[in-house]
């Protein structure tokens, strides 16, 4: 197999040698490359650009802060941007979640959550608690610490001797279960796995349960049954286990609520936010925790943790402006409305393409799963690399999608369809039209059956 050529003028490296077009500029739901090609961003980057690209209100806020102070080290100065954004953020949180710790991105933020939880246990005289139970499959970040709570084979395998593996339970993929139970019964059965694992590990050793309320890259917008998170919360309370919600991807309004967990009427003890928090205008993440947790840690000597750029004024000015746009333009309600339309469009495609096994998600965090058989959930041949091939074909249509393996990183395929929350009806139609042409090309490549009229222009 021929290796992709490295660009002769590039000193950068990332995961592979693959070279993408160089971006020129962006606006709303579109990006342009340096050749003038216009792309519809149907994945908001990596589910980041929640308010759209190049919003003038955010640009103005960044420029204003840049003229005042771009950086002030947190041990030397407080800054208005961080204080004001923390205040504004606490106002959109559930009651009691009102203490904020800023970081620079998702991995830093989730790791900060785990360390805060650990110090809280120590402050209560429960130093035996250190185990964090998470889901399989799952993704919580790429640091060595977070690989222990992540289960996504290709990311774990090279480093498995370098980190502490934490216990896992099955993710609530109730949509695949073939039994006579109701969805609520399935949800409770999946939640019961948490209690069984706590008892197996020893309740006195279990620190926290960590989960994405709506699944991200590892499960493709997985939505648990209505009964799942209320039962999880009850189990955590019973055994003194903290519930940490990783809302790095699903939070910040993408599902139609500022926190995705709100859909279940449940509150976590600690929340991680990033990605859409500053919507790509600056690297930013934040821990939001219950006041009693933070006060206990501060009373016990302080939070033994920090980052150089924690509370960076430029990043916080961007985040504050993004939240203002989110609220002023009613983008969470728009995520619900446009998400319902997009989901209906994806479900229509599901009727036309037999290899689409499931359409799922909430708001504008949506995905569809590819299968060889909709009844048995048999996956497409892994050698097809269907998820990445569809992304390539979509690029030809000037449509940007996000894809991953569905089953632990080795098999199964899903595509994430998560445009900016500001997308309008005409842009939704364009997205679905480009996606349909992409799927037709994929079906032709692999001789897959469709229910399209044989007169369709791409089929001839």
Predicted regions and their residues:
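Conserved N-terminal phosphate-binding loop of PLP-dependent enzymes in the Aspartate aminotransferase
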Residues: 1-460
